[in-house]
């Protein structure tokens, strides 16, 4: 009799609409219960039985129950699952399989089966890619996943690389394809094969994409020709190779090996500016005045060159610093190195006075054995030879940015707008508390930003600099010319790495159109979206492989008294993140390791400080001594402890 009763339906509807609900993200804990985090201030308790319906990271709508002053959440509807496609380790045998996601907060095995057509007999310990198929909040009985790809077996030494690439859905090898002959682009190539061009790279580099030639001019001026490898002489726009490069967007540099954007035959041979081999190039000729200013007679042209020497960073630096036993092979090469060092000096001073110069951070290099084991991690400081190449490339990119802006009005530009305008007042207020007075309007201009950066660089420590970093906007890739506040430049467009960056290949094609006096089509904005996304994924992959290798490298130091100098990079409620100075590893120091009495300890992310009994004991950028307390291989995390 109550079956289709409209009153009853109305009552149900009323009850439903009156029941309080909240949308938020599920946060799991080690203890079985969880929380529904609605925002930074508000969260609701989720009891263990209800946690079985959800997974850490799920965005859900939950019914809020109140009993005896205590509120709890009952998951009701799935808004967005945390897991869709993921990597994990297989448990069990072929008839009954489960997969444990490779994620620090997901410990439960999810029942699964292999997808149809996947011809691999899965066994315990295998790594696989899986996709979620069932979720309790979608009306399914339980969680269920389907294995869609076999990655590798559990004991494979190269697990860090294969699992990371699969996780981010990135290619594992070089693209297929060959380029048999150069295209007829209708370009006249200047013959510069007689000039003493040199390349300066790491000893192991095969994909040399830049060669340099310098010449002294009257009136204390210097001429610099930057010659860049010319892959677009082989790869036609819209061709199969071009499309593959467009998807990859960059060469992916991981510790130990790289996955090139172009086939190796092109990147490491046909396009690579090898010593004593004639190669086509796109070149830029510029004149530098005595104070390092780039004069207006910038010239882009196509050419052929023959590099006369493959020089190595450390050897060149040693020679310029009068150490080591390496000597340039001829006086002509020695003269090139001397002139290039002079150009570097002038350009460095010009940028210091008129733009911005980054503080030098060492690069960390993993030295790996045959089986992927980490033999050592070495800090490679940026020396004079690195700076020679860097200054030449920055100068060449400034030239390209100007030419593309003035002749076409578009290109692939690296744009960085400095501070987010919404943060300007908060930034000025923060700086004021530290005795620096800035105008909130002025700091949003390029000049105002540069002025502030120079003041910050003159501070005795980097503490204040670290505090304001959160107010900065991110660098972007844009087809529209715009300033790059981080470099202190009005415009910046890279074209000096076309073997490893697709955006540089696009700029090559645009520069060639300018050289030929032709009209060019503006690049589509979606290509900048693809490039930004690939850059993000490649960086995450590099970080993930690095974390794995750091954990392997430091595992035997856990629980020992070995001391490491460590810079504090971040402070949060739970403790401090530090970077080990000698090798670049990131470690976490939990708050209880800082002080035993929790009530006397204040870890403030906002202030970047740790206070004990009201006294500031640690702050971001401090360098302290730590020991390694524990290395958790399953989460690749390193736990450190300050040396008392």
From Swiss-Prot:
Superkingdom, taxonomy of origin: Bacteria
Record GO terms (molecular function): exoribonuclease II activity; RNA binding
UniProt domain S1 motif: residue ranges: 561-643
Record's GO cellular component terms: cytosol
Annotated PANTHER family: EXORIBONUCLEASE 2, RIBONUCLEASE
Record function comment: Involved in mRNA degradation. Hydrolyzes single-stranded polyribonucleotides processively in the 3' to 5' direction.
Similarity section: Belongs to the RNR ribonuclease family. RNase II subfamily.
Descriptive protein name: Exoribonuclease 2
Provenance organism: Shigella dysenteriae serotype 1 (strain Sd197)
Gene: rnb
